[in-house]
């Protein structure tokens, strides 16, 4: 993790309360990120990735969501303790988010330039003309002709809409960008274009970024650090090289085993058995133990702690941390 931390999350726990149960969405999460770095949050649906970033943005619906404990420091300021008025000055200006589905992220009755200009005027001020000019400049930056700023969202393809959303997120030069599966709704060729664009803009503006994805190919392409999440917890954290070259946790190994490898003669993919646990009724001990082929009695009884197995590489697994098979 970086010496100069822009973002630092400490012991974050977030629950959702239903009429008859508590959903344990995120439990005791610890992460940090430095200026200009990219962190990949990887895991299956329901791992707690989106809840984590929405907590950073403070856009979780409350109720039913509730931050039980923890701190989120951005540039030394705890975002969970400031007022909503103060947070509005940060949200969109210092911290911006690219949402998962560009089709539903844009207002259908406003031109795309007006939508970008609205963000610019809210945070940077200036006249309508100045904001509109900058909005058109941002469209050009993401590869859209400025004259198309007068068009409405329905006049753009899915990939072009995602470019508009990226332009809107970057309009105020945020120091920290959150991208929630920004390429999920796009076809493969457009995915590649959008990723290349994000890499270029990240380098140009030195923006720190959290990328939520379940695609390890995207992680390899764009991330410096990786946090593998399972059932609300980070089970493995390290640099991209740690995760790809020194995979340690059985769950992480299971994710890689699900990916076709053109360099082997393997004929079948090896899926991870079972399903993610019910977040209202989590298993005792390690949360992955019901699906883990190497689980021991200790795994079923004791919750594993995160241990640093090499500098900067953390794993929460009894098999790695002592008392089990290190080659699991």
Where are these regions (language model features)?
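Conserved ABC ATPase signature
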Residues: 151-156, 160
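Conserved ABC ATPase "signature" region
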Residues: 71-78, 129-147, 256-257
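Short catalytic/signature loops enriched in Gly
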Residues: 5, 149, 239-328
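P-loop NTP-binding/switch modules centered on Walker-like glycine-rich loops
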Residues: 58, 178, 182, 186-267
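A short, proline-enriched helix->beta-strand linker immediately N-terminal to the Walker B motif
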Residues: 171-175
């Amino acid at each position: 993790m970086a010496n100069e931390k822009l973002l630092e999350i400490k012991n974050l726990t977030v629950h959702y309360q239903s009429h008859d149960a508590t959903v344990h969405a995120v439990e005791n999460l610890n992460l940090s990120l430095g200026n200009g770095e990219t962190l990949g949050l990887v895991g299956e649906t329901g791992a707690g990735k989106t809840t984590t970033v929405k907590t950073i943005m403070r856009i979780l619906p409350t109720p039913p969501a509730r931050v039980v404990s923890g701190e989120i420091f951005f540039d030394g300021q705890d975002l969970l303790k400031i007022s909503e008025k103060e947070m509005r000055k940060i949200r969109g200006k210092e911290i911006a988010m690219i949402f998962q589905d560009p089709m539903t992220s844009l207002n259908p009755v406003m031109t795309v330039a007006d939508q970008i200009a609205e963000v610019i005027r809210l945070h940077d001020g200036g006249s309508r003309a100045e904001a509109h000019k900058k909005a058109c400049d941002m469209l050009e930056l993401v590869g859209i002709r400025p004259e198309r700023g007068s068009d409405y969202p329905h006049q753009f393809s899915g990939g072009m809409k995602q470019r508009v959303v990226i332009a809107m997120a970057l309009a105020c030069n945020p120091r920290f960008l959150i991208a929630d599966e920004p390429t999920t709704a796009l076809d493969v060729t457009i995915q590649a274009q959008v990723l290349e664009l994000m890499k270029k803009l990240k380098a140009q503006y030195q923006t720190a970024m959290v990328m939520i994805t379940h695609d390890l190919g995207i992680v390899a392409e764009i991330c410096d650090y990786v946090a593998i999440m399972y059932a609300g917890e980070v089970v493995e954290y390290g640099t991209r090289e740690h995760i790809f070259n020194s995979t340690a946790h059985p769950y992480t190994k299971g994710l890689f085993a699900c990916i076709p490898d053109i360099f082997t003669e393997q004929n079948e993919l090896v899926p991870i058995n079972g399903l993610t646990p019910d977040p209202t009724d989590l298993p005792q001990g390690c949360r992955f133990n019901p699906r883990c082929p190497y689980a021991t009695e200790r795994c079923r009884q004791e919750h594993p702690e995160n241990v640093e197995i090499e500098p900067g590489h953390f794993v929460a697994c009894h098999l790695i941390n002592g008392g089990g098979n290190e080659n699991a």
